[in-house]
Amino acid sequence: MAVETIQKPETTTKRKIAPRYRVLLHNDDFNPMEYVVMVLMQTVPSLTQPQAVDIMMEAHTNGTGLVITCDIEPAEFYCEQLKSHGLEQQH
């Protein structure tokens, strides 16, 4: 009886990296700056007050500010929370 070893062809499995989503804050002429900072800190618990102030000032100065970059589910949650507090892009 003969024994033969069959070699399995090498395959590499590459995991796709989940895309990251940016939550942006748009400047508006309606909400007071202090309110925007408070809402940012309530919505994104990892933000400190200086970070929230920086985001608000970036939006105020440049038109938009980057709130956070994250996976889609938290990004959608943060976006909805900000909108529910009146922080949404006005047309």
From Swiss-Prot:
Q: Per the UniProt entry, what are the Gene Ontology biological process annotations, in alphabetical order? A: protein catabolic process; proteolysis
Output the superkingdom of the source species.
Answer: Bacteria
One matching Pfam family is ClpS
Q: Which SUPFAM superfamilies match?
A: ClpS-like
Under the heading InterPro entries, the entry gives: ClpS, ClpS_core, Ribosomal_bL12_C/ClpS-like
NCBIfam families assigned to the protein according to its UniProt record, in alphabetical order: PRK00033.1-4
- Kindly state the subunit structure of this protein: Binds to the N-terminal domain of the chaperone ClpA.
What biological function has been recorded for the protein in this entry?
Involved in the modulation of the specificity of the ClpAP-mediated ATP-dependent protein degradation.
Q: Which family does it belong to?
A: Belongs to the ClpS family.
Q: What is the name listed in the Swiss-Prot or TrEMBL entry for this protein? A: ATP-dependent Clp protease adapter protein ClpS
Record organism: Synechococcus sp. (strain ATCC 27144 / PCC 6301 / SAUG 1402/1) (Anacystis nidulans)
